[in-house]
Amino acid sequence: MTARRRTRGRAVRAGAALLAAGLLAGCGLPGTDREPDATTDGRPRDASASPSPELKDTPGSPALPSSLTSQRPDWKRCTAPPGGRAPGSDWRCTSVTVPLDHGKPSGETISVALIRKEARDKDRRIGSLLFNFGGPGGSGVGILPRAAGSYGKLNSRYDLVGFDPRGVAASSGVRCRTDEEQEQAFRTVDLTPDTAAEEAAFIEDGAAFGAGCERRSGTVLPHVGTSNAARDLDLIRQVLGDDKLSYLGFSYGTELGGTYAHLFPGRVGRVVLDAVVDPTADGIGHARNQATGFQRALENYLKDRGQDPKTGSERIARLLARLDEKPLPTSSGRELTESLAITGIVTPLYSRYNWPELTAALDEAEKEGRGDGLLRLADSYNGRDEDGRYDTQAHSQRAISCADSKARPTVDEARALLPEFRGLSPVFGPFLAWDTAGWCAGWPVDGERETPETSAPGAAPILVIGTTGDPATPYEGAQRMADELGKGVGIMVTNKGEGHGAYGESPCVTSAVDAYFLDGKVPDDGLTCG
């Protein structure tokens, strides 16, 4: 799988990375105390006291039947997920029934899984705060209990609510191949093909993946896109009893949040988008952005090690070229291929706190001729456990991405991108250029649009947080999201730092977000931290 769409680094390491937040730098440009959506104690204004227009959904979307809108969640003790442990006694789980096809709301339905930890201060409870940690394909039901320690202050007055979006894990999760098939693909498919035979195998694997999705998950597959997930989110809001949506989205979760704001601007409450996907970029644009972003992060890492960025990048590129010819052995008996090594290098670039692990893994590969460290990092990114079982985030991720995007670049188009992408990044460029063709090759479902619609005129202020050294969602994408949301809606917050996501990493950003969620204080547009 590729770096272009995955945000597992934020999800898996959320708790550990956030615990290190106190090491980061402080804040500039103080915010104001604007409270357009709050009473004196920080609660959102009651709809009866300050009515806001319930703007209609996109034209032609039928109303939901009362059997769906009148649902009341039945919260029960959570059970253990497959291969995992049940969360603690503070957590409760339920599901909400949603239309399979929001264009036919009285037709077939599916269930969306939720998990909740209730607010500690019941007397001052504000409402529900929903989370999406990215992906697409990340399981909020699985991630939130592990990351909840980072949101203790918010949990004082909010119920913390995670959910598995449609097509993910417990919400009719998409599955496309067996663990054995996945292992075989990682072992044999070259994701930077150099010959006609490698190109053919590369495209054939993409088509086989799509066929497996259709065979195993055909009913839900056409309906797993982001616009449907955003409509699910609005039904969840209603079922939970919240007049407006309070939401914290990371990475892909920012695209979901922006889509929600576009569809339901009058129902936007307090929404924060962190590590922001560029809403103006298509598939090739995202690959181009990530080639730039990951190369920038790699060069910052090399500078931190006291190395020349150009020389260090060239050295790593030579290592990858050697692996293309001859993979490295590991103690497990598996081999470290070029493609797995690229993934292993990508993984620790999501957070500077994992840079020492990258150093150890590269030293092991270059000096000792062993691939254990990079393979271990790649396995973490790819969702592989020690027993060779893979989670299904990669399956859901591709299904959602290809349901969203109309783009289906060809092998010839990908090959034509190689010179440009090598110039952007000698390490990651070829990998990302080829990924544009392999990702949705032969996909059995047409995509919905070129780029997401995120304009939200009339919505309440939405905090848009960009980190200058973010490798996966480069800073410029946050600026474009703020612009697309519209004047007075997108409130830009800049974090001068490294890594994928700023909340919990930067005390300045964290303080601004907490004040916004808890007190309704909107920071100045252009707040800069670090």
Q: Language-model features: where?
A:
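Alpha/beta-hydrolase-fold enzymes
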Residues: 305-401
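C-terminal motif of bacterial Sec signal peptides marking the signal peptidase cleavage site
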Residues: 22-26
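Short, charged low-complexity linear segments at domain edges
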Residues: 3-4, 8-9, 186-190, 320, ...
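Gly/Pro-rich cap/lid or specificity-loop segments adjacent to the active site
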Residues: 30-33, 54-340, 399, 405-530
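Bacterial lipoprotein signal-peptidase II cleavage site
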Residues: 28-38, 42-44
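N-terminal export and membrane-targeting signals
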Residues: 1-19, 246
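A detector of low-complexity, intrinsically disordered, Ser/Thr/Gly/Pro/Ala-rich segments
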Residues: 5, 37-38, 56
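Extracellular mucin-like PTS domains
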Residues: 48-53
